[in-house]
Regions:
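C-terminal catalytic "cap/lid" subdomain
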Residues: 1-220
């Protein structure tokens, strides 16, 4: 749930989940217009169903990616740490740092940039102190979170997302997955958010799956 709320799942604020998570308290989500429907029950532990590895999909817009390239960057000790520090010193938290052999991308929330001059100042510092070969900035990005504890036991979850993006002619800007394998993050252009969200729901939650999950919820 924490991963979903991070990427725009609007029912809860991230901070609202902490006390119930710490005290192992189940949470019920219901439709205010149809409260008689069972809705969704959130618990700390549940029996995993390998047929439905994905628990939820959410998205959030308002991200900017700064891509920094330099030949032999991977051999330069402290390059990534210093790049992040320059943003932190300017009051801009770095959300994600996907990297390649000769490049890194710093993903930030666009709202944390006060003005074009603010960002230009940070980039000028990076250019002066780290001497990269190039710096590129891409705005108006969207991050998708695909979450599910059973994902680690299933092959093809990431492939289904990539196939969905490809079928809708959507270019993936970033992919990130932690070692726990309970969540994956994909970054795309914000203009493709709606069609991507519809495609991912169709890929992970076909009608028969929704019917089965609803029946299980009614039986609890």
């Amino acid at each position: 749930m924490r991963e979903l709320s991070y990427a725009g799942f609007g029912i809860f604020h991230e901070e609202a989940l902490e006390p119930v998570y710490r005290n192992d308290i189940p949470v019920m989500i219901r439709n205010t217009n149809q409260p008689e429907i069972a809705g969704t029950k959130i618990v700390s532990k549940k029996e995993l169903d390998p047929r439905y590895p994905v628990t939820g999909v959410s998205s959030a817009t308002g991200f900017t990616a700064i891509s920094i390239s330099k030949y032999l960057l991977n051999r330069e000790m402290g390059f990534m740490r210093r790049a992040i520090r320059f943003f932190e010193e300017a009051g801009v938290p770095v959300e994600h740092v996907p990297s390649g052999i000769d490049s890194i991308s710093l993903v930030i929330r666009s709202a944390n940039i006060q003005s074009p001059e603010h960002l230009a100042g940070i980039l000028a510092t990076i250019q002066d102190k780290l001497n990269p070969d190039s710096i590129q900035v891409e705005d108006d990005l969207c991050i998708f979170a695909i979450v599910g504890e059973a994902m680690r036991e299933n092959v093809g979850v990431a492939a289904a997302a990539s196939r969905t993006f490809a079928e809708n002619h959507i270019n993936i800007r970033m992919i990130s997955q932690g070692a726990s394998e309970i969540s994956m993050l994909f970054m795309i252009k914000a203009e493709d958010e709606d069609i991507a969200l519809q495609g991912l729901y169709q890929a992970y939650f076909p009608r028969e799956a929704l019917a089965t999950l609803a029946a299980a919820a009614q039986g609890e």
